[in-house]
Amino acid sequence: MKTQIELARDGIISRQMEQVAADENFNPEIIRTRVAAGEIVIPCNPNRTNQKVVGIGTGLRTKINASIGTSSDICSIENEVQKAIAIEEEGADTLMELSAGGNLDKVRQEVLKAVNLPVGNVPLYQAFKETGRKYNDPSKLDPEFLFDLIERQLSDGLSFMAIHCGINQYTIERLRKQGFRYGGLASKGGTFMVAWMDATGKENPLYEQFDRVCTLMKKYDAVLSLGNGIRAGAIHDSHDRAQMAEMIINCELAELGREQGCQMMVEGPGHVPLDEIQANIILEKRMSGNAPYYVLGPIPADTGAGYDHITSAIGAASSTWHGADLICYITPAEHLALPTEADVREGVRATKLAVRIGDIAKYPDRRENERLASMARRDMRWDDLEQHLLFPDIARKTRASRAPEDGGTCTMCGDFCAMKKGNEIFKDDIKNDKIAPGA
């Protein structure tokens, strides 16, 4: 079986490429060209026939990933399945199943059955969890068990994986030599891999046997998302030498993976101050050959716990604007607790708004929906306005809960409604289209 990137290089427009082109209003040949170049990926494990086709990358609508998963403290398969269903209902594009407690195979399989979204994971979680259960010591992890586990997970139908290939002895040495890390290590999988390397004195097998990782991913046409295990967990650590060392390696691996016919994506931070986000995107795009960039937020302040879905949305709007391709949501529970169903819904909504704001800036020719919404608001055509809103159900419920006396207005202004008064003054004078320059 050939992967999407191999088919594209052979000049073949696959069914999945056709679907992405139709969904995004592109000529299929443009999609094929960008898939061939590694600028667009399409997670599409053939073992999962009910999966929604989603394109991620250059020129496409910025996509949203939402994550779920059990922990050692809270472990309910039913809860995670309900969260997965809620995430799909709210409009996320991809889902990561990141369980670390309970029957991990069962959680993954139930989630895969419950939704149609492309599903990914971090295989190191289960690898270290099961090793810890067996030996009471995660550092006893056998690399052969890890590779067997990756294939087992892929065979279930996972379409992308965050795999920490960029951590190696060199990146760890950079971290030790710089002598500081205000936020420590923020990646669970990355931290356990560093601990394994420290305990064994060996190189990271995911880096050392990178070709083997690519072979497994190619077998299932899954996207290899190069995880950032040394990412900054505090804005004061942003772009330190350790993070940059891993980023350089990941960007190099993205190129090597593409050469082997593997669909590749690079993961980004993390915690990044607002003034550094653009530079971060430029660096990844330049060094990776424009590989799709999967950004975890980013979170541009460290003091927003309880409202980090808002903190992250601000960073996500900026990173989307500057070229990020896939944004991982953050929920209000981030840094505090395992999220509830209500938390994941709120996280998707905040991120949905953030990427819309970012896409308006990234693609100025895609603002028509905003224009139509504005005109409907101006004319007090409430039913028409709802058709153009990101969250029509919320808008409808809020307005109905405090209904105005005049059905054309709302209770914010009542008799002082600027829209109503403006329509009385100007009637049809301001209802024409703007004349384009030079027309």
Swiss-Prot record:
Record Pfam families: ThiC_Rad_SAM
Top enzyme class: lyase
Keyword flag Transferase: no
Residues annotated as transmembrane: none
A GO molecular-function annotation: metal ion binding
Sequence positions that bind substrate: 96, 125, 164, 187-189, 228-231, 267, 294
InterPro entries, A to Z: Cbl-dep_enz_cat, ThiC/Bza_core_dom, ThiC/BzaA/B
Binding annotation for [4Fe-4S] cluster: 410, 413, 417
Keyword tags: 4Fe-4S, Cobalamin biosynthesis, Iron, Iron-sulfur, Lyase, Metal-binding, S-adenosyl-L-methionine, Zinc
E.C. no: 4.1.99.23
Co-factor remark: Binds 1 [4Fe-4S] cluster per subunit. The cluster is coordinated with 3 cysteines and an exchangeable S-adenosyl-L-methionine.
GO biological process, one term: cobalamin biosynthetic process
GO cellular component: cytosol
Cofactor(s) for this UniProt protein: [4Fe-4S] cluster
Catalyzed reaction equations: 5-amino-1-(5-phospho-beta-D-ribosyl)imidazole + AH2 + S-adenosyl-L-methionine = 5-hydroxybenzimidazole + 5'-deoxyadenosine + formate + L-methionine + A + NH4(+) + phosphate + 2 H(+)
Binding positions for Zn(2+) per the UniProt entry: 271, 335
Highest rank taxon of the organism: Bacteria
Entry similarity comment: Belongs to the ThiC family. 5-hydroxybenzimidazole synthase subfamily.
PANTHER family, per the entry: PHOSPHOMETHYLPYRIMIDINE SYNTHASE, CHLOROPLASTIC, THIAMINE BIOSYNTHESIS PROTEIN THIC
Functional note: Catalyzes the conversion of aminoimidazole ribotide (AIR) to 5-hydroxybenzimidazole (5-HBI) in a radical S-adenosyl-L-methionine (SAM)-dependent reaction. Is thus involved in the anaerobic biosynthesis of the benzimidazole lower axial ligand of the cobamide produced by D.autotrophicum.
Subunit field text: Homodimer.
Protein name stated in the entry: 5-hydroxybenzimidazole synthase
Species annotation: Desulforapulum autotrophicum (strain ATCC 43914 / DSM 3382 / VKM B-1955 / HRM2) (Desulfobacterium autotrophicum)
Gene: bzaF
